[in-house]
Amino acid sequence: MPIRNIAVGSHQEVYHPGALKAALAEFISTLIFVFAGQGSGMAFSKLTGGGATTPAGLIAAAVAHAFALFVAVSVGANISGGHVNPAVTFGAFVGGNITLFRGLLYWIAQLLGSTVACFLLRFSTGGLATGTFGLTGVSVWEALVLEIVMTFGLVYTVYATAVDPKKGSLGTIAPIAIGFIVGANILVGGAFDGASMNPAVSFGPALVSWSWESQWVYWVGPLIGGGLAGVIYEVLFISHTHEQLPTTDY
């Protein structure tokens, strides 16, 4: 059971060179992802005169985020696991695959990466505002359910393709599968709540623009969805090896 595998770890872990390198990898991967994802939306809006919220803008956002996440996960996979998302890190924690202290280190790196990406975008685009997440035609509770379900699908995909020790050669396509599910979910939820699935992705633009409306939805929803996916996959589908009982010949 994952609850028995959950580990707090030691505070000294945050100073370990391996943990610091992993955190740096998360910072860089998240910066790459947010810069490309947010930047594509800003560029599309500039070229179309505010058309980022049109059907074409939604498709462009889905494709850009899918490609960017594919790259971000790939470049970080061998160093940190390529989480690029506090909800993925939380799902790994509740499944017993990362310690609390290392997970918190990842969170800090991911939030910093998103924030720096948004500041860089604002500076390099002549002061254009980064796109913040908001609700359109749905209540906060409906948006919360959307974020839970979409993030569940994302973290479940992460477990199936990257975490499961039985994944075999499937692990080679993990970044592609993870990018695809995010792109597909953006097509589903983008028109309603922006389809964050990632607290870091919504935190950076909110901080830079200082716009916190419904921000809690983009934390609570992904963390619930990611946590549920981690526990369910770990409990139901990851087999734990047991020592065979000795046999006696009569």
Swiss-Prot record:
GO cellular component: plant-type vacuole membrane
Motif NPA 1 positions after renumbering to this chain: 85-87
Subcellular location: Vacuole membrane
Membrane topology: Multi-pass membrane protein
Free-text comment about domains: Aquaporins contain two tandem repeats each containing three membrane-spanning domains and a pore-forming loop with the signature motif Asn-Pro-Ala (NPA).
Similarity comment: family membership: Belongs to the MIP/aquaporin (TC 1.A.8) family. TIP (TC 1.A.8.10) subfamily.
Function statement: Aquaporins facilitate the transport of water and small neutral solutes across cell membranes. May be involved in transport from the vacuolar compartment to the cytoplasm.
Protein name: Probable aquaporin TIP1-1
Species of origin: Oryza sativa subsp. japonica (Rice)
Lineage: Eukaryota, Viridiplantae, Streptophyta, Embryophyta, Tracheophyta
Gene: TIP1-1
